[in-house]
Amino acid sequence: MDIPWYTDAQVMLDAHPELDVVCVCTPNGLHAAQALAAIESGCHVVIEKPMSLTRREGEEVLHAALAHGKQVFCVMQNRYSPPSLWLKEMVESGRLGQIRMVQIQCYWNRDDRYYGKIPWKGTRDLDGGTLFTQFSHFIDIMYWLFGDIHHIQGRFADFNHAHNTDFEDSGLLTFDFVNGGMGSFSFSTAVDRQNYESSLTIIAEHGTVKVGGQYMNEIVHCDISGYEMPELPPSNPANDYGDYKGSAANHGYVFENVVAALSGMERITTNALEGLKVVDIIERMYASASRPMKSVTSS
């Protein structure tokens, strides 16, 4: 097939005024500017996570979309996993009662097999940090289920990535949910050889639930008063990149939603405001403590 290719997004947009939707799947630090260019060229946009690396840039995308009457779809495909959809129903139905404590643990491997292949990964300006690149999916799930957080306290460390990244590889965060309850989020990419887990534990008024597996794809524990756990559909496997694995391979559902939403048949699963909120939460998490940032000097 004779498919045209470009090294400049604006050149592509200028050459193809017939485009309806543009997918922004470039390095994180380019997402906002390229989404803005697409919107201003008359396109709807699908933005891979994160929407941007700062709240200010995300707000610019949101305002441009409103001004031009365009839709923004943020790729947060873990929402489509059966355990995530089940948790959403359990929380929104009130079956769990008051949420008292939430603990999220994300322990993955990202070593030279990952950072050594693609130069922008691990850089401050184009990657942004582990919360943006590896774990924003799970911050999105947390926000989607329980709402916003405040009173954030954090600690960050770089255990074994000083040679290949500009920032932390691990962190511990505690906070309160605005809607009530306490939370904690611990993460690391310093796990040896392979991913260990991504888990979410809920201590609630009417019971306890834990979702685990490598990317919150398994129900590990369910003990809820007067409730019998149903059999959920199987989760899709993780995105497999050879030497390492990512989150759930649910991108097909994202694009089904894009088509359905633009056809007026569905609501957007993860809209611009939700994508912006994830960036805002990460920005506040990082602001809660000193990060082990490598000094970057301009040449």
Where are these regions (language model features)?
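Beta-loop-alpha module in the N-terminal Rossmann-like domain of NAD(P)-dependent dehydrogenases
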Residues: 3-64
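Hydrophobic residues in well-ordered beta-strands that form the structural core
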Residues: 7, 47, 72-74, 185, ...
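C-terminal helix-rich "cap/oligomerization" subdomain common to oxidoreductases
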Residues: 11, 19-24, 257-299
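Rossmann-fold dehydrogenase core element
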Residues: 59-77, 98-103
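Predominantly a Rossmann-like dinucleotide-binding segment in NAD(P)-dependent oxidoreductases
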Residues: 78-164, 292
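Contiguous beta-strand/loop segments that form the cofactor/metal-binding neighborhood of enzyme cores
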Residues: 133, 139-217, 252-265, 298
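Active-site loop of classical SDR/Rossmann-like NAD(P)-dependent oxidoreductases
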Residues: 242-255
